[in-house]
């Protein structure tokens, strides 16, 4: 009996320690603005942190699609990248550290150095013709791709999702050559095809790595193997339309566009909820004005990232542009 009591106490202690590890505190007014601007500008994209701790935020500005900030939140510079980097990640490999991005309005993929130099491109005609074309009202073939997100697997394969189109997930080699496609409306997971699979991320918390699919049209998120098989549901109830995610240690943070940031453990249990907004008309919209923003309360979370210390940064779908930060306690 004493042994059982000791084990029980250890279990409670472990649970308490685990809970303490996922507490966060808002860092008010963390991010600055570019010179002469009251806000960062029209946001409908993503946020990421490089290995040096610099913060990259995409905005809807022509030839100035990425703003770079220091670890202290102060504006540093703008990169001359496309204005519609709806989804991007920063990944480090043996050949360096690069930004990988899905250019929504141009339906192409880019790989760029962190100074903004584009070193590789996957153009629209590299995608399978039967997945990337449609007929307009006049019967003319048009490009139907609507690329929203991308990520890179440990072996260098590139995953690109057609999240505003048919939700196909395209796989390209590190050299930019097409390899395969899965997902879309014809691949059924728990009775439903992929729908508005807004963003996908390679989840290296698992071995082998898996692909996280934020299937926003069905208000759910699930894993598949990197070949698209073996779907595993993470959550399909109680979500607020998951739009982006990031990983740190065993944790995953999720930006939910209907007004919430959630944090999940590796077993798929939600362990924290941040910035919840239940005010009608203030979520799933880009039009909430700065006068209506409330400290620590989100509007329409669209992009999210952990930094190297496990702090959370979130960027919103907002025509004025907004970034919030929560520090890990």
Short names for language-model regions:
Residues 27-38, 119-141, 177-195, 272-296:
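Surface-exposed loop and turn segments in beta-propeller and other repeat-based domains
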Residues 28-64, 148, 320-321:
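Beta-strand-rich domains and repeat architectures in extracellular enzymes and scaffolds
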Residues 34, 63-104:
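Blade-loop segments of beta-propeller domains
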Residues 37-51, 82-100, 127-157, 187-210, ...:
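Beta-rich, blade/repeat-based domains predominating
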Residues 54-57, 98-101, 157-160, 210-213, ...:
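Conserved beta-propeller blade signature
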Residues 60-61, 104-106, 163-164, 205, ...:
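Short loop/turn segments immediately following the C-termini of beta-strands
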Residues 208-214, 237-279, 286:
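Loop/turn-rich, solvent-exposed surfaces of beta-rich toroidal or solenoidal domains
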Residues 297-329:
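Blade-level signature of beta-propeller repeat domains, shared across WD40, Kelch, NHL, RCC1
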């Amino acid at each position: 009996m004493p042994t059982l009591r000791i084990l029980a106490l250890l279990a409670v202690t472990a649970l308490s320690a685990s809970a303490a590890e996922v507490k966060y505190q808002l860092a008010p007014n963390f991010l600055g603005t570019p010179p002469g601007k009251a806000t960062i500008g029209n946001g409908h994209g993503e946020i990421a942190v490089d290995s040096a701790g610099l913060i990259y935020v995409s905005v809807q500005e022509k030839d100035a699609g990425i703003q770079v900030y220091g670890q202290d939140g102060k504006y540093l510079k703008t990169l001359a990248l496309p204005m519609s980097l709806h989804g991007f990640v920063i990944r480090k490999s043996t050949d360096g550290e690069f930004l990988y991005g899905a250019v929504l309005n141009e339906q192409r993929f880019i790989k760029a150095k962190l100074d903004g130099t584009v070193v590789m491109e996957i153009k629209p005609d590299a995608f399978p013709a039967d997945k990337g074309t449609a007929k307009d009202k006049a019967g003319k073939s048009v490009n139907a791709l609507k690329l929203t997100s991308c990520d890179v697997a440990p072996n260098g394969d590139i995953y690109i999702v057609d999240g505003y189109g048919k939700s196909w997930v395209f796989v390209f080699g590190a050299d930019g050559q097409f390899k395969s496609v899965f997902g879309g409306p014809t691949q059924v997971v728990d009775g439903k095809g992929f729908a508005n699979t807004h963003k996908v991320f390679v989840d290296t918390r698992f071995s082998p790595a898996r692909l996280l699919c934020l299937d926003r049209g069905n208000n759910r998120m699930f894993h598949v193997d990197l070949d698209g098989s073996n779907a595993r549901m993470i959550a399909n109830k109680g979500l607020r339309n998951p739009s982006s995610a990031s990983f740190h240690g065993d944790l995953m943070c999720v930006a939910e566009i209907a007004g919430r940031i959630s944090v999940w453990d590796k077993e798929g249990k939600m362990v924290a909820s941040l910035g919840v907004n239940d005010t009608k008309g203030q979520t799933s919209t880009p039009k909430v004005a700065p006068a209506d923003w409330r400290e620590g309360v989100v509007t329409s979370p669209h992009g999210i990232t952990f930094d190297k210390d496990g702090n959370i940064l979130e960027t919103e779908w907002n025509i004025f542009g907004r970034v919030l930060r929560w520090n890990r306690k």
